[in-house]
Amino acid sequence: MRLIQALSLCLALSLSLAAPPQHKEDHSHKGKPGGEGHKHELHHGAQLDRCKGIEFDAVAVNEEGVPYFFKGDHLFKGFHGKAELSNKTFPELDDHHHLGHVDAAFRMHSEDSPDHHDHQFFFLDNMVFSYFKHKLEKDYPKLISAVFPGIPDHLDAAVECPKPDCPNDTVIFFKGDEIYHFNMHTKKVDEKEFKSMPNCTGAFRYMGHYYCFHGHQFSKFDPMTGEVHGKYPKEARDYFMRCPHFGSKTTDDHIEREQCSRVHLDAITSDDAGNIYAFRGHHFLSITGDKFHSDTIESEFKELHSEVDSVFSYDGHFYMIKDNDVFVYKVGKPHTHLEGYPKPLKDVLGIEGPVDAAFVCEDHHVVHIIKGQSIYDVDLKATPRKLVKEGTITQFKRIDAAMCGPKGVTVVIGNHFYNYDSVQVMLMAKIMPEQQKVSQQLFGCDH
């Protein structure tokens, strides 16, 4: 009997020693959506899919304007692509603080404060980290109260508000329904009430607008008053992510998404009749006069399926380049896929893929192909076709899409486009042309 008791005691002790300790760290805080607190789960081995509807912990842009979306210990860079561990880019977050989540983040825009301008700030519990060009600044991390006196710990969101959007260079902090405007020069804090806004779980400034994320939706707001104008909230996956299919939408919903999406274009072209076709992910937008149409690429170009690298129009046909293949469709209703295609890009145009953009200008038979900063010409009437380098683009490191029309060459980079009178002007230009917004000036989005 005593032997059995002794064995039982040994077994109990071994189990208690083997059992992992419970993680007692609590990041919940009052006022967060979802009850008593908003829990940040650890996802170290998780495969996160932002198209399934993720509530992000923080959103910010880097010094090159690329959005960073944080969830748990993961980070999404840009509008598409897989998540990666945050400590791959910001290793010190783990060195100084076991990284379970980032509470809030923003990139400082304050030209009057060179010590802070273009720095990225990350907030974890009661600490703040300052990075410049992905390197942790000396003496960081610091207590939030030391850098931003009067601002509470365990924040929900933060966003910069530079002049003239705010009267002075300011940072707006969110915690539950409490809003704090922090003046970067005087260190003064003004508490405000944004009655028409939901509680933000993330916030960021993008293309001159201010966005509050709540769940997988967002609202555009006035940084001074918190007023939300227009039809909000909207679905974040429609405007800030490249997601093929989710939910049910009307025809108008599809058109508005493609008009107003902040995700960069993959390709754009204008046919012989002057109609514009813009391609993004799994969808395309066509503009005929003042009429818009949107659908999936697969619905009208089923052999292509989705995601093109570049498209150009020539002699009543679309030449659609994807990886190292060329698909050709005769323009019409419906568009007709030509037999024998796809063919290798090398055989058709004499260049290896991938390419960034391609276009033919009116009444010409030369296709201009952009790859990196190089631009090549191919005479489409020549047999065999020969690739000739025309020049080097010096004003941009990379181009997302380009087309040529009555107004000259349109170059698309991210959410902006630039017009040049001709290819030669683009190659020789010393002064940057006016920067215009794709969603508004090109596609007529009203928000």
Swiss-Prot record:
Biased amino acid composition, Basic and acidic residues: 22-44
Start and stop residues of the Hemopexin repeats: 53-93, 99-151, 152-197, 198-243, 262-304, 305-351, 352-395, 396-441
Residue ranges of the region described as Disordered: 20-44
InterPro entries tied to this protein: Heme_transport/Cell_adhesion, Hemopexin, Hemopexin-like_dom, Hemopexin-like_dom_sf, Hemopexin-like_repeat
GO biological process, one term: cellular response to estrogen stimulus
PROSITE patterns from the UniProt entry: HEMOPEXIN_2 (PS51642)
Primary localization: secreted
Keywords assigned by UniProt, alphabetized: Glycoprotein, Heme, Iron, Metal-binding, Repeat, Secreted, Signal, Transport
Compartments in which it is found: Secreted
Signal peptide: 1-18
Family: Belongs to the hemopexin family.
Biological function: Binds heme and transports it to the liver for breakdown and iron recovery, after which the free hemopexin returns to the circulation.
PANTHER family associated with the record: HEMOPEXIN, HEMOPEXIN DOMAIN-CONTAINING PROTEIN
Protein name: Hemopexin
Naturally occurring in which organism (per UniProt): Danio rerio
